[in-house]
UniProtKB/Swiss-Prot annotation:
Keywords: Hydrolase. Homotetramer. Changing residue 17 to N: Drastically reduces catalytic activity. No effect on substrate binding. It comes from Pseudomonas sp. (strain CBS-3). Hydrolyzes 4-hydroxybenzoate-CoA, and to a lesser extent benzoyl-CoA and 4-chlorobenzoate-CoA. Not active against aliphatic acyl-CoA thioesters, including palmitoyl-CoA, hexanoyl-CoA and acetyl-CoA. It comes from the Bacteria. This is 4-hydroxybenzoyl-CoA thioesterase. Coiled coil: none annotated.
Length: 141
């Protein structure tokens, strides 16, 4: 079973559009934070350290597929559950499931996203994908 890490995000008034629901780009900002949180909780060093030690600048997104199930609004507290769904040679699929607890105590799925990400190095001209480091896979398993 894939290792799963959760984090919470309180929705503030400023995160919402005039209708009072979360403005959708904010989900992607929170998913990016959840991605980094996942690697930190699994024991990977901060990107500023990996760039010095290995030349790895981070895990840019190659593709993102998001499905929104219901709305969320300010004062909701979201739980973002993150795992690696699939490891590939030069990429991986990171799944995020975002939920909230209703006033009645039920857990309600708000949205789910699968991101394809790569570990990247800067070769001086551009970012390029590298093979996923085996020790990183081990830390995240």
């Amino acid at each position: 079973m894939a290792r799963s890490i959760t984090m919470q995000q309180r929705i503030e008034f400023g995160d919402c559009d005039p209708a009072g629901i979360v403005w959708f780009p904010n989900y992607h900002r929170w998913l990016d934070a959840a991605s980094r949180n996942y690697f930190i909780k699994c024991g990977l060093p901060p990107w500023r350290q990996t760039v010095v030690e290995r030349g790895i600048v981070g895990t840019p997104i190659v593709s993102c597929n998001a499905s929104f199930v219901c709305t969320a609004s300010y004062d909701d507290v979201l739980t973002i559950e993150t795992c690696i769904k699939e490891w590939r040679r030069k990429s991986f699929v990171q799944r995020h499931s975002v939920s909230r607890t209703t006033p009645g105590g039920d857990v309600q799925l708000v949205m789910r996203a699968d991101e394809i990400r790569v570990f990247a190095m800067n070769d001086g001209e551009r970012l390029r994908a590298i093979e996923v480091p085996a020790d990183y896979i081990e830390l995240c398993s």
